[in-house]
Amino acid sequence: MPVSYEFIRTASWQPVSQDATVVAHYRALRFPEAWREAILALCNLGRPDGAEPYRTVPTYRFEQVIQAFAPDLLVLPRPSEHWLYVPEEVADPLPGPVLRSLVDRWLGDLRPEPEHRAFLKDVRAELSTSPPVWERVEAELLRCPTTLGGGTAAPFEHQFPLSPDWLARRVLALGPYEHAAGRLHFRAVPRGPRDKGAELVSQPLPFPSGTRTWWYSVVLNITLHTVPFDPLPRFHLHFGIRRWATRVSSTTGKVRLPYRRKATVVLRPRVPYLPGAPLSERYALARMERRWDREKEEWTTDWVNGGPASILRGISLAETLPGADEILSSPEEWLEQGLRAGIVYSTAMGGHEVKAGLMSHQRSKLTEWAEQALPAELRATPALVRTRRSKSSKPLNAPPASVKKEDKPEESARRAAERRAGAAYAVSCLTPDADPETLPTLEARLLWQTRELREAGVSQLVEHLGLKGDGGAFTEAQYEAARPGDPVVLEWQCAELTVRLRCIKLTAGLGEGLSLPPKGTRRTSSAISAAVHDRRTNARSWLAQDITDKAPTLAVVELDRRADFETGDHDPKFALRLGFADAGAITQFATVPKKDGRYDSLKNLDHRVSMAWDDGLRQLGIRVHPTHSLGDKIPAGLRYAAVWLVRKNRTARNRWAAYVPIAVLVTPQDFGSGIARVQGWDPEANKWIPYPALLLKLTRLAEVSVADADNGGRGSYYRDMNEQRRNTEEWLQKMLRSLRGTPTLLLAHGQNARSHWTWLQDGRVEADRIRDGHALARRLHPDLRLVRVRTGRDRETAQWWGLNPKEEANGLPSHLWVPESGGVSRVFYSTTPKPAQFKTSAIEADKLAPRPRRAGERKGETTIDTNIPGWNPGLVEIAVLGCHKNDGDDPESLALAVHQLRQPPDYPQALALPLPLHLAGLGQEYVLPTLAEEVEDEATAVADLHSIDASVVSAGDGDPDPAMAAGLFTEQDPEEDHESTRVDGLPEPTPPMPHDYGRIPNR
């Protein structure tokens, strides 16, 4: 029998009260103010006119050295009262002579040019007269103030690194974690000023599979967070799997590092690297990269910027840092020596037999063990209870969970009829001037390359919409001869609408790779921009011959997957999307069916093409909207608006930069019909326009000037941040004004929007108020409700599990969860089921030791789950920031309505975001390339799970954030790579890193 879960627990801790206090003792070092002007003068010496000057001292390289050679030191973001901390009981990791030598070498590394040696000598002499002094300081680790208007905990800046580190040290003091097959021995990993919280990593564990052994560790991250309107801060614990790269290429004899990616290396020296420094119990860190050597004009693999040892030239190290080639050539030997060196695996390095993630029950047991380290001043965060606002947490029009075999044809016909009704309504919205006596016409295009996909495309459209007949009989020669303006046209007549499909073979070289230098040759941003521009122009000219109607249309395009092109840069997908949009068509891509080694897209061709039609038609506004089950608990006629900010920095890895706010408005029509009007905000016309028209309009924002491609992105973006914020809030003012007159619930994604709409930050928000411009915060307009959604990105929501009432394995129930405490809450949590592909992932799965099978034909046999992905649905926080309780609004009911918006009836799986936010976010596909950036490595990834494998997960319009998929949070993209090319020994100035507490540190 299925377990009925009443409660869930989160892997989080909080103080027992606002008065709880813990004071820790440290030795701390201030960054000497007397040094600032001299070092800045050195850094800005000879900078070209117009270049962004340094306003804060670039200590990044110095901090890199500390992570490698003095890992016990905690580095805080500057400016802060103190820069470096070490617990009082830890031996001095940087004795005076060592520190002085490091500073001298660091200054020389900042400006190594011979012409600046005299100036460098003067700066060294000036700094030597005011050496930094270690101070004994006390630091409050728990108690913190609250925000004036919102009553939200506002931790001090030092608490974000120091408090998690204190808890991590307490967990280490517990000793090893005992499990059925052995013990886990954890060590701490150093954290820099951009890292969040503390991290513990276990010893490497072997996993024999086939003819080789794969290696992995268990990792624990502890981070400090806040929750809106809660005066108590929270500590989140995230347990996961870290995999080690040991596969050596048969061609090079080394581990493969993808170009333009950095790999983290964890180090454990046998003796201290620095003479006179103590041996730390912590691991050390350094980073490798594969980069283009401009002098040699070839790709090379080495430590980033020469590695931390390069800054110490002239200092005799007690043990030399291993060479990059040594580790890359014999990675397993270095692991087997007690993790003397381990390369953190990333998905770009190829496959790995150990799969990421831990399942719910094992997480709960690891958390239970860690809770033994809790001091009296902390407690586990209380359990959450399921909502009682509705009998079911599903929408009223949710499809049945299971359908009998004999009833499947009837259910399929019902759903097809829903889609046809939605299509008729969406098309009528696109053509408001059409004759109302004439049936609306849905016209789409199938741009095919292979006969197999063309035939599947036709048959799946027929099945998807429940069409009758074949639409017309044509020969293969007619299909081959079809061209833009003279296509093969298939047509079906239905009671609701006419469906017309124009089939055209993709020709003119549009499906080929972009015209770029070959693999192994450097490709500049200007060359790529020019190639994209050319293909975009050709695509527009080609398809425009077939489009005469001004209304947006849909094109399903058959194209090779990215891996089939020479490099990812050669993939023409983004250029085709832009060009076809210029011609008036929104696009959905389907990969060419083929079998290539382990890759086989032939076996699921029908399913993939069906999903392509599904996703493409949704872009036209054809969808079934979830109908809430709350009756009069929410306002009648409630609309749903959502904002999404497309913002991307131009970096070495991302060649496009963009900033544009997007708003979507979903207006349900007849209650229970599932039909809704979907519109987007046009800031130029200051009005709402059909959603597909918005998508087409967004492509203009993807224009990249070839002349500016190499020099127009990064510096100007950072200088314009304040202007972008002003523009965002002015845009918000106009958009929000248009929502008056009808009850509307406005949704925003916290991690996405708060950097530009700062009111969404925990440190600024106040209940039932809003600020969207220069004016002071004001009460919400009577028609507006404001809800902020937050996901597991940056570990901002905790890991979780259901509390099994039978004291059996803890599972993963889906529902809306509310705090147990009395009173009216404002913050709720949403969970959804695992996708169908992972229903067999056992909740009691064990990655460390064999366990008995619980069910199936092999029940009772032992198995181990190290090679099984640990898929867990993410925990979504729903914070009702603003409503009108005095007028009858119930925050819990509003939150349940948002929870139900994650479950559209026409999607195969639940969404990670509510539907309106999902639609707003998908607009970024028309502004930026949609390729999910590869994870650098699992040391910089910050979420629970591994990236979705496209060969496992069905096609579908995934959630807009590449870190999220349907109902799941996957292994996260790392933080934006701010490491830029070095000019004269200096990295470019880096921007501030926003976070959720109302304060933005200067870097």
Q: Residues of each region from the PLM?
A:
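Long, contiguous domain-sized segments
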Residues: 2-289, 294-306, 314, 354, ...
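Long, charge-dense tracts
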Residues: 294, 299, 304-570
